[in-house]
Amino acid sequence: MHSRTLIKNAIIVNEGRTFVGSLVIDDDRIEEIIEGKDVKPQLPPDSVIDAEGCYLLPGVIDEHVHFRDPGLTAKGTFYTESRAAAAGGVTTVIDMPNTVPPTVTKERLLQKIELAQQQSLVNFGFFLGATPDNAARLRDVNPRLVAGIKLFMGSSTGELQVEDKPTLRTIFEQSKLPIMVHCEDTPMIMAKMKEYKEKYGQDPHVRYHPEIRPAEACVKSTKEAIALAREFDVKLHVAHITTAAELDLFDPNDKQITAEACLPHLMFANEDYERLGARIKCN
């Protein structure tokens, strides 16, 4: 059944502007955006939603999600996580490759696409994981299938860590797609872990987590990734930066090299480990 809906007098955020206006939806398509308060649309609506005082935003694109499908579905599936995304106003997601098995070949990518086509309630894309085995072939990756390359320069879930310097150079040289990178200096972290285990036993208290994985480990690795991106003229996006020291490495006007932050790193500080413990622990 054909239906026209008017969302009126909302605070609309769109294309770099914020203004009071109304939106006309014809079935499932946006037909008209009207600037101004109480402005009537060209055709009468079937239903009206008064959104005065509320913000109206376009669907959010989340370019860093971990839907855990396949292989880790006790944590989530394309259906459960895309349902949560839709409920939060996220209409497009780009999923990470550290699943089981990891998404590092065309065959595994196609399997993942098929899973998402069957289950996802929102638009989706995928990152291909960079490894020593596929580094020399990244130039041949089909941009219609892959949104970008995910590179783990630090240890995380999925056994996808790459630290070998020649391999890192090959990845940046071969990739014609944007590279998203997880930046941590693992040797520095391992040395700190050894030091703290010698001091405090095999299971150091979580309060020491920010000292075992220090900001310096992130800064050092991030500087290396930025230098490689500049050398090979590759678009780079640094994932989940955690400190002001990292933020200082980026120019907000430079669209070639960008970064993101996660909400926990904005909401909590090192002192909160005493109160909240492992609930806020994150590499």
Report each predicted region and the residues it spans.
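Metal-associated gating/positioning segment near the N- to mid-region
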Residues: 54-119
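Short, surface-exposed connector motifs at secondary-structure boundaries
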Residues: 90-94, 119-123, 226-235
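Active-site metal-binding motif and surrounding structural segment of the metallo-beta-lactamase
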Residues: 39-56
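Alpha-helix-loop-beta-strand connector modules within alpha/beta enzyme cores
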Residues: 106-122, 170-181
